[in-house]
Amino acid sequence: MPRTKRVYSGKTITGVLYPVAICMLFVAINVKLSQPEQQEQSKVVYGLFHSYDTADSGTITLYLIGFLILTTSLGVFCYQMKFYKAIKVYVLANSIGILLVYSVFHFQRIAEAQSIPVSVPTFFFLILQFGGLGITCLHWKSHRRLHQFYLIMLAGLTAIFILNILPDWTVWMALTAISFWDIVAVLTPCGPLKMLVETANRRGDDKFPAILYNSSSYVNEVDSPDTTRSNSTPLTEFNNSSSSRLLESDSLLRPPVIPRQIREVREVEGTIRLGMGDFVFYSLMLGNTVQTCPLPTVVACFVSNLVGLTITLPIVTLSQTALPALPFPLAIAAIFYFSSHIALTPFTDLCTSQLILI
């Protein structure tokens, strides 16, 4: 029985890098448009905290991690018990809340910040068209490109929503804690995400396209056995009867040769599925960098996220198993962020003040 090995081409890898880059750029542009420098708006952590002391950052992070662990565990439990309708209702409610409700406040803030004159009926008509089409594309049949576009919009708006309600340093603490939780949830034997992947592979179903970004919606066909030559097939056939008798006589003198089992490995083009949470946290980190740092640091974090994701994908090819997509990109982005914030930004400021052109 040939063993199947999934390989990932450059086209498949870029099929994931492009949407991640688009999502991060969408968040960065929207953060700049909604919060111009001359109008800095205060953030409010709804229902939890009303001050931004450093001591509160750890408490907020614990609340977020607890909520994430609870929702992930409940989602995996519902999936294993086949409570598909409950999961679909939860995902549908989140999509409506982000694409229809929150988008009203977000785009209203952009219109006010940029002094864009829009009438109320026109504004609500555009939001209804945007959100209604998005919900239809995410939860029912639609064109593949349109479905992928609204997955990116959903992740980007979710990242902006989280960014607007969290203090700056709390974002970094939350991202660090979420990265460790991602490792535990995916790699440990009792991790909920590992159990989810194993259950989905065992059932062979993909019932929730609204929470997974698929690099391709097409299934590549495996080559038929006729096109693959087995190594045990003889290259020469003897038709001469004397040769046949000679072989038969020799076989009486020699012990029978036990054929060695040769295991064929068939390479199949695989598709990469990235959770929408990964899109959200990549964009959350970049959006926080846009708020607090100059352009060189933003560019460094943007590139480092893509580099970290590019490092993760070959490891997936070698291990042939699901891996957490957050630790490598966020670790490299954190290194670039702090090194750029400590060394590069003061250096460029000094060169600018001294009129030194490099």
Swiss-Prot record:
Intramembrane residue segments, as ranges: 322-342
Cytoplasmic side: 1-12, 79-86, 137-148, 192-273, 319-321, 343-358
Family according to the record: Belongs to the peptidase A22A family.
Domains as described in the record: The PAL motif is required for normal active site conformation.
Protein's cellular compartments: Endoplasmic reticulum membrane; Golgi apparatus membrane
Location of the motif PAL: 324-326
Protein name: Presenilin hop-1
Source species taxonomy: Eukaryota, Metazoa, Ecdysozoa, Nematoda, Chromadorea
Annotated Gene Ontology cellular component terms: endoplasmic reticulum membrane; gamma-secretase complex; Golgi membrane
UniProt topology in membrane: Multi-pass membrane protein
Induction pattern: Down-regulated by spr-1, spr-3, spr-4 and spr-5.
Gene: hop-1
Matches recorded under Pfam families: Presenilin
Organism: Caenorhabditis elegans
Keyword tags: Endoplasmic reticulum, Golgi apparatus, Membrane, Notch signaling pathway, Transmembrane, Transmembrane helix
Chain residue ranges for the region called Disordered: 221-242
